[in-house]
Amino acid sequence: MSCKKSARTREKLLTAAGDVFVQKGFRDATVAEICARAGANIAAVNYYFGGKEALYQEAWRHCLAESLRAHPPDGGADPAAPPEERLRERLRALMGRIADPETKDFFISQMEIANPTGLLEEVMMRELIPMREKTLAMVRELLGPDADERQVVFCEACIISMCVHPLIMRRLGQKTPNARMPVIVDDLDAFADHVVRFALAGIHASRTPARAS
């Protein structure tokens, strides 16, 4: 098999695996279905990856790389821009990733949290922690030198939750239109602007000592 053909087959397997894992999760996905979708011999998974478990890990990493290519985590912000602008673009990029119907890694991660296999724990930590550290650094910068680490983590958790939960509900509503779920986000740009304003206002409020009642 030529190197080019081998690389194409591997790429097709990763793409097919991402589709199957995001639809069915790890346990219900089968090697046979993945190979059939990829147009590959059923022995191809063992040949290229050594088994379903390693394919799961590599497929998630491949899906993440694809979504980050489409939605760079920094949102294209100038590294020298003020922290407010850098945080704004970072949050808009995150929300764009989650809202994008082509994004698979995020929803594979959600399925892994709901039904853990333990197979993605190491690779997720290796890939996601550096991105989280950059967000924490921006929040830390915005809170100022007097902020303690607990305050930084609390603010970051609230901000990311505002980005994630409504867009998960939006995706669920799109997938199950007959469920008549309440519309939370009907305008992604307007929602992103709102989240950024709310986040920056919350950070500003956290910097201001609470008045004694």
Describe each PLM feature range.
Residues 1-8, 175, 208-213:
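N-terminal intrinsically disordered/low-complexity leader segments
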Residues 9-18, 34, 59-67, 135:
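Generic hydrophobic, amphipathic alpha-helix propensity
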Residues 12, 20-54, 58:
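Helix-turn-helix
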Residues 68, 85, 117-143, 190-193, ...:
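Amphipathic alpha-helical packing segments from all-alpha helical-bundle domains
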Residues 72-104, 152-159:
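Hydrophobic alpha-helical connector segments
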Residues 80, 129-153, 176-179, 203-211:
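Hydrophobic alpha-helical bundle segments that form small-molecule/ligand-binding pockets
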Residues 91-94, 106-113, 159, 163, ...:
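Short alpha-helical scaffolding segments that buttress acidic/His motifs in well-ordered protein cores
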Residues 100-122, 170-176:
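Amphipathic alpha-helical segments used for helix-helix packing
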